[in-house]
Amino acid sequence: MQCGAACLAMIVNSYGVKCSLEYVSQMLHIGKNGVSMLAITEAANEIGFNCQGQLYTVEQLKEAQMPCILHWNQNHFVVLFKISKKEVFCIADPGKGLLKLTFEDFCRHWISTEQQGTRGTVLLLTPTEKLENFHIDKYHSNKSKHVLWKYILKYRYLYIMLLLGLFVGSLLQLVLPFLTQSIVDVGIKNQNIGFVWLILLGQLMLTISRTAIDFIRRWLLLHISLRINISLVSDFFIKLLKLPMSFFDTKLMGDLMQRMNDHSRVNTFLTQQTLNITFVIFTFVVFSLVLFFYNKLVFVIFLLGSILYGVWMTLFLKRRKVLDYELFEQQAINNNKTYEFITSMQEIKLQGCEQRRRWEWEDTQADLFGVQMKSLKLQQTQEAGSIFINEVKNIIITVVAATAVIHGQMTLGMMLAVQYIIGQLNSPVEQLMNFFYSLQDVKISLERINEIHQMDDENGKEGLQTSIEDKSEGIDIKNIMFKYDPHALRKTIDDVGIHIPQGKVTAIVGASGSGKTTLIRLMLGYYPVLEGKINIGNTDINKLNKKWWRRQCGVVMQDGVIFSESIARNIAVDDGDIDKERLLKAAEIACIKDYVMALPLKFNTKIGRDGVGLSQGQKQRILIARAVYKNPDYIFLDEATNSLDANNERSIVENLDKFYKGKTVVIVAHRLSTVKNADQIVVIDHGNVVEVGNHESLTAKRGAYYNLVKNQLELGN
């Protein structure tokens, strides 16, 4: 989904301007359906390019300015950097890396099926002077580099204890090759069984000491690991709760779950690999010095072999990074598909689409398997080379050491000690390379986590106010314009101006998709308007602390959520101690009290996914009770009674009419019975206000409102 952002970032960086993928992604406002070429064009213009979208033949493309962005396979974007004289096309694919394609392969991916197989879509980008002055320092903080230190320093004393344990353990391990040499060169050579037993007893004591140290180290490691993991995930959740709703509109559930898994990777790196690498480096340095002391030639052979091993392993780093990103995206899609498959079981069975939905899931598994196969091939190639280099190095060292023993340059005990040291050094070299791999993986994970932490909170710098000036002025909506995708042509809300009087009931009606729910979301501060202004009293909504503002509101949305908790906790969601009197009153107004009191556990009955199942009408009544329990000054109801039967709806509407006294109420509804008693009715059509009045005046006018309600019972004839 980020292929468009990656392509634009690559082109910007190719001109020597540093630009992160996160920054470009924010400029593009990438949604769940990806990004359009129009969005890429507008973002590129802002950065400093003149853009031109064209339908070109391959011959025209050869004359075009490069790098340029190509529409690939009708659903993807890539960058074309160069076309050689032999017609080899150099492509940068965000999902696959650098590719060199033949003329036939290139045409198969690029040529549009809608252009009779002759042309493809290309976005040409010409740099301007604006690009040279483009700075994004704000988005190039070193936070992702030093964020780990916050957690390490927090538990620095425990880390110091662990490091001491590691150093003591490695020092004890250092004694072992000398003991091995002593057994062979002194005990066995002199046939001194007492000396052999003494050395073996020493080895036993060393083993017991190392085991005890390792036992304590593991407990400390578990303690630190749990604490850091909780801190990491908790900080992530705190940040998520501060983000605007627009963020959640653009992210798949699977994407967020994958970022949660990234925290486990970071936690493992912090608590295990950072400590182990300290131990590994210490072991490597000390044993290398001992090996140098025993035989300089063996040391040189080992060093050259290790360098060759390291060079071989680093050749795969860049490709592994590309595959990691590809695997991340595919796992996110897979998680999302699996979650949807399980939670939609009822609808799947009702519609009889079991086979098709299963095939869709299997297609996702096939795509995931394809990426995993590419990772496995890369890993096998890497391992085959590393094993070959290591084995050749070990064989050469064995030959050199054996030759030295034969020529009297080394004793047999020294040779055994050298073999032990080589065995101990091979592991640190491998662990060092694994550490660099883990470091690369953690950098990728930190980039993804940091992308969230660097996003602006929904309150921004202005939204700190926790009071409303001149509340009696009601809510004033002044010529606002809004669209969910800033790059879209169609406006969801267009030049809407409404005054919602304080202490009165205002109903918003209109056909489905006309913008009613969006208007409520804007009044709740879900999204900033693109033009115009919303005032609560005389206070700009952008200056209000959004969390504080929503606490002043009782809200029932169409997609309200029932938590897996007791009925009482579902109604009093934000209260530390539940006010039983308010709880009963709220349940009574919502006409849910009789149902609850008939249950064995009454208000302590658990509902939601893990509890008692509820009908849609019962869910709506609990959501209404939740809004009433807050006893707010502002109430927003979005189709709050559309799942209720006529009798229950009539009773609840009558109860709410009494509850509304002195409160500012905004209702979105289709049913006439819900809106006809409103003090003011606003009719919206395609994002525009077309009528304002009360039920009597609008009915008499026989305009848009009349056409909406005329088929309902009271106006049927």
Where are these regions (language model features)?
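Cysteine-nucleophile protease catalytic domains, especially the papain-like/related folds used
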Residues: 1-53, 60-66, 72-74
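Noncatalytic regulatory segments and standalone regulatory/sensor domains
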Residues: 28-35, 41, 62-73, 77-165, ...
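An intracellular "coupling" helix at the cytosolic face of ABC transporter transmembrane type-1 domains
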Residues: 245-246, 258-270, 274, 319-340, ...
